[in-house]
């Protein structure tokens, strides 16, 4: 799929400079997502995750490909100036984190028919999410 995507992209009718800048961004997005996956797997081996570590995973793994990458790639292909690209980058990271938090909420309380994801799967897999972290830190002994 990646190779086909690259092939389609390189044959698209954009100026060569824009293509190169965009390919660099796409490669960075893939790299960040990979780093996020490594961080996420590493969190799975820890007994207790810290909020800052979970948020770092969200920024690298989720925000890079759901919000930051697509917005920046689109802006670069549209010929946006560096200042706008930087503003989009800054805007998109917290948006991607919010997306992941919402996904985690739906994973615990959503309707499987709507989400396509089994309710409680993160909990059963021992995944350390912000919701679970805060429930363990702030919940009563009964809630934990």
Q: Residue spans of the language-model regions?
A:
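Mg2+-dependent prenyl diphosphate-binding active-site environment of isoprenoid biosynthetic enzymes
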Residues: 1-141
């Amino acid at each position: 799929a990646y190779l086909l995507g690259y092939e389609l992209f390189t044959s698209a009718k954009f100026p060569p400079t824009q293509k190169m800048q965009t390919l660099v961004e796409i490669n960075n997005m893939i790299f960040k997502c990979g780093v996020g996956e490594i961080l996420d797997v590493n969190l799975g081996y820890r007994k207790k995750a810290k909020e800052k570590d979970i948020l770092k995973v969200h920024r690298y793994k989720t925000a890079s490909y759901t919000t930051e990458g697509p917005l920046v790639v689109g802006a670069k292909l549209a010929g946006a100036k560096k200042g706008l690209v930087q503003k989009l980058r800054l805007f998109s990271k917290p948006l991607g984190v919010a997306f992941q938090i919402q996904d985690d909420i739906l994973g615990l309380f959503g309707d499987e028919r709507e989400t396509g994801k089994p309710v409680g799967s993160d909990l059963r897999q021992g995944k350390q999410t912000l919701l679970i972290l805060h429930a363990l830190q702030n919940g009563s002994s009964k809630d934990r």
